[in-house]
């Protein structure tokens, strides 16, 4: 998520980022990403959530830094790391502004459809920061939900009741704006009667590849159950 988005709704759903869900997701993605991992690699997990993937990567013998803007998720990540004896480093920061360094990472990953929180005009900033942080030939693994599927589901106002960390949450899809390729989503937590509105941006594979090819070479795209996982190599 970016600094102009309210953080609270992401913390409300912290239970969806914790170990069990993370383990189920890892089972799906690891067969496709293990070719890009080797012991001793330095890895950065961008928009890492509660850190289940970050910690898993550290347990494969890599040195991992996880970055996320939501303080509640980073707190959960640190707790889980202590519980599992992991040495993964977690930083609460905006991935669009946090200094990642230059040429220090062997691999960058960004899972959980996190890019939908990036305004389209900010994506080149994200791309360039990852490019600078990677070593020559370093891969970026990017996982996302196809935006057209999301538009089809959310093009009409509707409500979905979901279970958050401590209460039920009503997620209401308000409207889709075809000009900005974004839609408004309202989150309402029943236990505290709090409401936040966020903007989610639509990305599709061809658009992502068009934005990425300026500095990265597209390698492959893998269809998962509800999303796609693309691999790009730093030119």
Map each language-model feature to its residues.
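SAM-dependent methyltransferase
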Residues: 141-210
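Class I SAM-dependent methyltransferase SAM/SAH-binding core
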Residues: 52-97
